[in-house]
C-alpha cells in the first residue's frame, strides 16, 4: 500500500507488522478509510518520496508541556504529536521535562523519516484521484462533458478539449492530443508549429502515456486530427 499526498507517494509498511499498524493508526487510517485501486502505470505518475524510516532504537519521548522532543544520549530533536505517537507505539519510553532543560541540550538529527501529521483521507464520492504535473496527488470534482476513452489505456475518461487538438511536449517527444483523448506522436516541434498549435501544453510523459495511443502522424494527418 502507498500513501499518496499532494507531494507524491510513499510506501507504507506491511499492515500486518507493528510498524504498519503504528503508522496507520497515527496518520488516521481506520476500517472506514477508502483504499483506491491504482494500476502501476498511474502509480508511477506520482513522484516517489523518500521511504519511511524508524530509528533502530526508539529515543525517549519528552513532553515539556510546550512541545514534544526525542531525547538520545547525544541530544534532542523536536517531534510532532503524530511522530511521538508512532515512537511510543514502538516502545519508546516517555518522560516529562522543562523547556529550560531541553534548551540546555544539543540539537541532533534523528535517523527517522515519519509523517509529521494526520491526514484527511478522501473517497470516490469527493471526486476523481489524479496525478498533477509535479507528481502530487490531486482530487478534482467529477466533471460533466468528459468522454470515455477508446482502445487500451489506463485512463478511463478524458476532458478539457471541446474542439480541436492540442500540441504537447512530453519531455520525451511531441504529440497531438485529439478531443477524443487519443495521443498521436508527431515528428518534431516544427510540425506542431506548422499546425498552428505550437506547444500548447507541457505534460510529463508519465501522465501523457496513460492516454490511448493513436497512430503516429505525418504533417498532413496531424492537420486532419487537429481540425
Per-segment meaning from a language model:
Residues 1-227:
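Short, surface-exposed polybasic-aromatic patches that bind anionic ligands, especially phosphate groups
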Amino acid at each position: 500500500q502507498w500513501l499518496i499526498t499532494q507531494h507524491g507517494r510513499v510506501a507504507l509498511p506491511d499492515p500486518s507488522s507493528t510498524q504498519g499498524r503504528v503508522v496507520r493508526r497515527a496518520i488516521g487510517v481506520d476500517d472506514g478509510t477508502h483504499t483506491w485501486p491504482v494500476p502501476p502505470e498511474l502509480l508511477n505518475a506520482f513522484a516517489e518520496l523518500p521511504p519511511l524510516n524508524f530509528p533502530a532504537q526508539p529515543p525517549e519521548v519528552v513532553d515539556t508541556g510546550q512541545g514534544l522532543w526525542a531525547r538520545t544520549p547525544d541530544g534532542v530533536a523536536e517531534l510532532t504529536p503524530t511522530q511521538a505517537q508512532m515512537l511510543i507505539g514502538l516502545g519508546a519510553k516517555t518522560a516529562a521535562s522543562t523547556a529550560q532543560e531541553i534548551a540546555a541540550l544539543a540539537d541532533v538529527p534523528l535517523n527517522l523519516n515519519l509523517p509529521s501529521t494526520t491526514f484527511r483521507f478522501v473517497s470516490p464520492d469527493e471526486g476523481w484521484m489524479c496525478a498533477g504535473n509535479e507528481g502530487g496527488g490531486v482530487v478534482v470534482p467529477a466533471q460533466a462533458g468528459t468522454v470515455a476513452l477508446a482502445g487500451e489505456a489506463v485512463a478511463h475518461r478524458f476532458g478539457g478539449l471541446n474542439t480541436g487538438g492540442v500540441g504537447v511536449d512530453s519531455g520525451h517527444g511531441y504529440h497531438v492530443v485529439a478531443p477524443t483523448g487519443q495521443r498521436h506522436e508527431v515528428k518534431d516541434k516544427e510540425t506542431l508549429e506548422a499546425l498552428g498549435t505550437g506547444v500548447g501544453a507541457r505534460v510529463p510523459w508519465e501522465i501523457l502515456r496513460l492516454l490511448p495511443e493513436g497512430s503516429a502522424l505525418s504533417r498532413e494527418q496531424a492537420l486532419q486530427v487537429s481540425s
